[in-house]
């Protein structure tokens, strides 16, 4: 009897271990030899497990994107036994069990097309635990519906109507910079511009900016927390899908003890919860779609402009489930986070390049005199600034209708998303050279398991920065050369524009590009005409890409671009 009991105990102990070992062995065999992706070149360890990728992300300072570039070179030619010849396979490499990465500038527009259904990689989508937001939406059809509700707010006419709000934020930031400069301490442009961009987005979203630009040291603690929050999200993509929702639902002290970066999420939760209690209370005061008649939302009444989320929660075009508090909070958080980070990168890099190249700054100032005769002149209108060729020369035949020569150059080399643009071709296979890339599956985002079977998805990705530093298109690509964009015929300009994709393209392209451009065109002329700025303890490495923290980030020890502020000689 005792022997039977001991045997049963041993069976209970060893059976799960044996089952796990068999499952692991079977999964390894499938991924290496039987998977539809097994035929594609790439390291076997990457095909076997995502731990290969996570090693470079977690332990090599988020530098998997450069490792991928090395893999393309390593697998540039492969011997094909059937034909006894070498085939050029470098442009396509398997970088994890589910994903193929392609390095070919002509394929980018096939992968980022408006045609067909494109799901998002579930591993990337769940990293910030905001499946209700546009950026966290996996399913193509749901994403299209949510994006369609947001896009009208970023039309050129809507941005022109917001011009006075942006100008008010520009004036406030310049006042803060002037006051800070009087202390004799250098201003951190990265933090200051991030406060400005976040305040603009907050004001447009819900008539409450948050007042980051008013805080001492330009909210340096909040800015550091936000950066750490982005990195925490990147780490989360390698954890089970249930991890982030559980952590976000836990008490604040537990979140902070698990990851100090969770403090950033906690701050945002408190602000957004309070905000949406106010919004939904206001919603009860009047009929759907008639926000202007509600009298108990004093922030909206005082704002004097339409706001995105007041309109969204009362939109007759969205079903009730799309207007729930939880989803709208997630949408707001994603929008503020994305709008502040990316715009501040462009502003910081642009101002640094101007200060490091006095001849370019001098030429820009000379052009600005046509609309700003002196430092005390009234601010020009956005339309006036958009007409300046050196600052904002319209690019022909481009969706970037108002991306200027200088801004374009900065955006291409030093800003935008450094992370891979990942797409799941849901309804059809893709074809690249002689390769057939199998389609993914159609599945609702709520029931796609993160540890799904390998047939559940085929992720196809490209890294935009590889296109933007292609020396065949841009000789000496890291040099600050505005003249490369001047005096071009249409064919030459189109060739340069083809690789210019800092904000992505297609159905998943940046929704807020028009707002971001308006912020840039209005703030940068103000900075270079109202002040004489002098670099302090800063160099090019403080703006160059070094770390993939979703957006590009400079080296980890960078303190940002700092400047001394002096009275303008403009």
Curated annotation (Swiss-Prot):
UniProt enzyme class: oxidoreductase
Assigned EC number: 1.-.-.-
Cellular localisation: Membrane
Keyword Transmembrane helix part of the UniProt annotation: yes
Membrane topology note: Single-pass membrane protein
Residues carrying covalently attached carbohydrate according to the record: 191
Any Pfam family hit: p450
Binding site residues for heme: 510
Domain of life, source organism: Eukaryota
Transmembrane segments: 9-29
Molecular function via GO: heme binding; iron ion binding; monooxygenase activity; oxidoreductase activity, acting on paired donors, with incorporation or reduction of molecular oxygen
Pathway(s) where this gene product acts: Secondary metabolite biosynthesis
Family that this chain belongs to: Belongs to the cytochrome P450 family.
Name this protein carries in UniProt: Grayanic acid biosynthesis cluster cytochrome P450 monooxygenase
Lineage, highest ranks first: Eukaryota, Fungi, Dikarya, Ascomycota, Pezizomycotina
């Amino acid at each position: 009897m005792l022997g039977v009991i001991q045997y049963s105990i041993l069976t209970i102990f060893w059976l799960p271990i044996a089952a796990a070992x068999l499952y692991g062995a079977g999964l390894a065999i499938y991924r290496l030899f039987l998977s539809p992706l097994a035929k594609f070149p790439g390291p076997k360890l990457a095909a076997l497990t995502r731990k290969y990728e996570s090693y470079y992300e977690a332990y090599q300072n988020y530098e998997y994107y450069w490792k991928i570039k090395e893999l393309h070179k390593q697998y540039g030619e492969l011997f094909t036994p059937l034909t006894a010849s070498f085939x050029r396979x470098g442009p396509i490499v398997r970088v994890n069990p589910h994903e193929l990465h392609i390095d070919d500038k002509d394929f980018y527009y096939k992968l980022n097309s408006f045609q067909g259904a494109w799901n998002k990689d579930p591993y990337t989508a769940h990293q910030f635990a905001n499946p209700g937001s546009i950026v966290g939406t996996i399913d193509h059809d749901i994403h299209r519906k949510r994006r369609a509700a947001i896009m009208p707010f970023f039309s050129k006419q809507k941005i022109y109507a917001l011009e006075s709000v942006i100008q008010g934020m520009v004036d406030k930031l310049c006042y803060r910079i002037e006051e800070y400069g009087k202390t004799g301490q250098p201003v951190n442009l990265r933090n200051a511009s991030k406060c400005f961009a976040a305040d603009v987005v907050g004001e447009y979203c819900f008539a409450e900016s948050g007042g980051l630009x008013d805080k001492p040291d330009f909210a340096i603690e909040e800015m550091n927390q936000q950066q750490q929050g982005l990195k925490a999200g990147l780490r989360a993509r390698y954890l089970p899908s249930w991890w982030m929702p559980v952590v976000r639902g836990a008490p604040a002290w537990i979140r902070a003890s698990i990851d100090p970066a969770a403090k950033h999420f906690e701050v945002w939760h408190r602000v957004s919860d309070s905000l949406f209690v106010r919004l939904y209370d206001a919603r009860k005061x009047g009929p759907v779609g008639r926000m202007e008649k509600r009298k108990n939302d004093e922030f909206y009444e005082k704002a004097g402009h339409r706001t995105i989320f007041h309109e969204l929660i009362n939109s007759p075009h969205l079903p009730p489930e799309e207007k729930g508090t939880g989803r709208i909070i997630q949408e707001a958080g994603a929008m503020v986070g994305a709008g502040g980070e990316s715009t501040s990168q462009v502003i910081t890099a642009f101002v640094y390049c101007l200060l490091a190249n006095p001849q370019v700054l001098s030429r820009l100032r000379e052009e600005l005199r046509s609309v700003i005769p002196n430092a005390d002149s009234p601010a020009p209108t956005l339309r006036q600034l958009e007409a300046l060729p050196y600052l904002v020369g319209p690019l022909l035949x481009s969706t970037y209708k108002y991306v200027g020569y200088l801004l374009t150059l900065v955006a291409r080399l030093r800003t935008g998303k450094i992370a891979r643009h990942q797409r799941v071709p849901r309804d059809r296979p893709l074809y690249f050279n002689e390769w057939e890339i199998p389609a993914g599956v159609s599945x609702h985002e709520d029931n796609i398991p993160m540890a799904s079977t390998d047939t559940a998805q085929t992720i196809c990705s490209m890294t935009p920065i590889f296109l933007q530093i292609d020396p065949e298109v841009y000789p000496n690509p890291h040099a600050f050369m505005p003249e490369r964009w001047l005096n071009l015929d249409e064919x030459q300009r189109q060739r340069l524009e083809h690789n210019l994709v800092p904000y992505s393209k297609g159905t998943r392209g940046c929704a807020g590009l028009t707002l971001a451009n308006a912020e840039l065109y209005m703030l940068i002329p103000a900075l270079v005409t109202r002040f004489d700025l002098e670099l302090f303890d800063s160099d090019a490495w403080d703006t160059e890409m070094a770390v993939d923290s979703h957006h590009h980030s400079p080296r980890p020890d960078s303190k940002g671009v700092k400047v001394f502020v002096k009275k303008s000689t403009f």
